[in-house]
From Swiss-Prot:
Membrane topology, from the record: Multi-pass membrane protein
GO cellular component, one term: plasma membrane
Cited function: G- protein coupled receptor activated by antipsychotics reserpine leading to an increase in intracellular cAMP and its internalization. May play a role in locomotor activity through modulation of dopamine, NMDA and ADORA2A-induced locomotor activity. These behavioral changes are accompanied by modulation of the dopamine receptor signaling pathway in striatum. Modulates HTT level via cAMP-dependent but PKA independent mechanisms throught activation of RAB39B that translocates HTT to the endoplasmic reticulum, thus avoiding proteasome degradation.
The name this protein goes by in its record: G-protein coupled receptor 52
Extracellular side: 1-44, 109-115, 181-200, 287-296
Keywords of the record: Cell membrane, Disulfide bond, G-protein coupled receptor, Glycoprotein, Membrane, Receptor, Transducer, Transmembrane, Transmembrane helix
Sites where a glycan is attached: 2, 13, 20
Length: 361
C-alpha cells in the first residue's frame, strides 16, 4: 500500500514539473544506480575528469597567451583566445551535471536546468566551430594575399567578427526555448532531458544547414587551397634548387611563407581533431532526430567525446607550436621563481624588488 502511494506521489510530482534537479537523474550507460551509493559512478567519473581537464587546460592557454606577447603577432590569436574562453565556460558549465549526479541541489526545476544547460553548451561549441572556420579563412588570406593581408585583416575587423560569432551562436539555438526541439544531448544526464525533451528533424536540419555544414565547407575549401598552394611553392623551390645550386635568393624569398605554412599546419591539426571528435556526435544527432536510431549509451558517449575536444585544443596547440611551448615554459619558470621568492622572503625578509614584467617573453 505504501509503495503504491509512493509511486502515485512520484507520478504526480513528475507531471506537475516540480521535481528538483537533484532528485532525479539517469544513468545513460545503462548500469543504473548502485546499491552502496545512489550515484552513476562511471558517468560521474567521466564528467568530473573531463570538467577538471577542460578547466585546467584552458586556464593554462589563457595565462600563456597573456604572458607571451610573441603569440599576439598572429592575428589568429584573437580566435584562439576566444575558443579558450568558450571552452573554459564549457568546463565550468559541466559542473552542473556533476553536481546533479552527486545529489547537490541547485534549487531550480529540472526542466529549466536541462534546457539552459543544453543551450549554453550548444552556444559555446558553436562559437568554437565558427572560430575554427574563421581561422581557416584567415590563414587562407595570409597565404594567398600576403601583400594586402594587413589591410584586409585588422584588429578592429577581428573584434567585430568575434562579436558577430557570439551573436550568431546565441541566435541559432534560441528556438529550442520555443518548442522547436532539443539542440543536442548535452543535458541528457538529466532524466527530463533524456525522456521528455525530444529532438526534431526540422530543427536538426536547421542547425546543420546554418552551422555545421557551412563551417565544414569553409574549412575544407580553405585548407584544400592552402595545401595546394604550399605544394606548388615547394615544387617551385625544389626546381630552383635543382637548376641553381646557389639558391640563397630563392630561399630568402620563400622564408616569409614558411611561418605561415607551419602555423597553418598547427591550426589544421586542431581543426582535424575537432571534426573527428564531433563527427560521431553529428551523425548520431541526425540519425536520432530522424527516428532511425535511439541509444542512450551512444548518445552519452558521442556527446562527451565531442565535449572532450574542449581539452584537446590546448594539448594540440602546446605540442605543435614552439612559441606556445616557450611561453608555457616561461610561465612555469615565473611561477617557480615566485614560489622561491616567497620562501626566501619568509626566511630573510628582504626588501621587495620590483620587476618590469615577470611573465613577458
Amino acid at each position: 500500500m505504501n509503495d503504491s502511494r509512493w509511486t502515485e506521489w512520484r507520478i504526480l510530482n513528475t507531471s506537475s514539473g516540480i521535481l528538483n534537479v537533484s532528485e532525479r537523474h539517469s544513468c545513460p550507460l545503462g548500469f543504473g544506480h548502485y546499491s552502496a551509493v545512489d550515484v552513476c559512478i562511471f558517468e560521474t567519473i567521466v564528467i568530473v575528469l573531463l570538467t577538471f581537464l577542460i578547466i585546467a587546460g584552458n586556464l593554462t592557454v589563457i595565462f600563456v597567451f597573456h604572458c607571451a606577447p610573441l603569440l599576439h603577432h598572429y592575428t589568429t590569436s584573437y580566435f584562439i583566445q576566444t575558443m579558450a574562453y568558450a571552452d573554459l565556460f564549457v568546463g565550468v558549465s559541466c559542473l552542473v551535471p556533476t553536481l546533479s549526479l552527486l545529489h547537490y541541489s541547485t534549487g531550480i526545476h529540472e526542466s529549466l536546468t536541462c534546457q539552459v544547460f543544453g543551450y549554453i553548451i550548444s552556444v559555446l561549441k558553436s562559437v568554437s566551430m565558427a572560430c575554427l572556420a574563421c581561422i581557416s579563412v584567415d590563414r587562407y588570406l595570409a597565404i594567398t594575399k600576403p601583400l594586402s593581408y594587413n589591410q584586409l585583416v585588422t584588429p578592429c575587423r577581428l573584434r567585430i567578427c568575434i562579436i558577430l560569432i557570439w551573436i550568431y551562436s546565441c541566435l541559432i539555438f534560441l528556438p529550442s526555448f520555443f518548442g522547436w526541439g532539443k539542440p543536442g544531448y548535452h543535458g541528457d544526464i538529466f532524466e527530463w532531458c533524456a525522456t521528455s525533451w525530444l529532438t526534431s528533424a526540422y530543427f536538426t536540419g536547421f542547425i546543420v544547414c546554418l552551422l555545421y555544414a557551412p563551417a565544414a565547407l569553409v574549412v575544407c575549401f580553405t585548407y584544400f587551397h592552402i595545401f595546394k598552394i604550399c605544394r606548388q611553392h615547394t615544387k617551385e623551390i625544389n626546381d630552383r634548387r635543382a637548376r641553381f645550386p646557389s639558391h640563397e635568393a630563392a630561399a630568402s624569398r620563400d622564408a616569409g611563407h614558411s611561418p605561415d605554412r607551419r602555423y597553418a599546419m598547427v591550426l589544421f591539426r586542431i581543426t582535424s581533431v575537432f571534426y573527428m571528435l564531433w563527427l560521431p556526435y553529428i551523425i548520431y544527432f541526425l540519425l536520432e532526430s530522424s527516428r532511425v536510431l535511439d541509444n542512450p549509451t551512444l548518445s552519452f558517449l558521442t556527446t562527451w567525446l565531442a565535449i572532450s575536444n574542449s581539452f584537446c585544443n590546448c594539448v594540440i596547440y602546446s605540442l605543435s607550436n614552439s612559441v606556445f611551448r616557450l611561453g608555457l615554459r616561461r610561465l612555469s619558470e615565473t611561477m617557480c621563481t615566485s614560489c622561491m621568492c616567497v620562501k626566501d622572503k619568509e626566511a630573510r625578509d628582504p626588501k621587495p624588488r620590483k620587476r618590469a614584467n615577470s611573465c613577458s617573453i
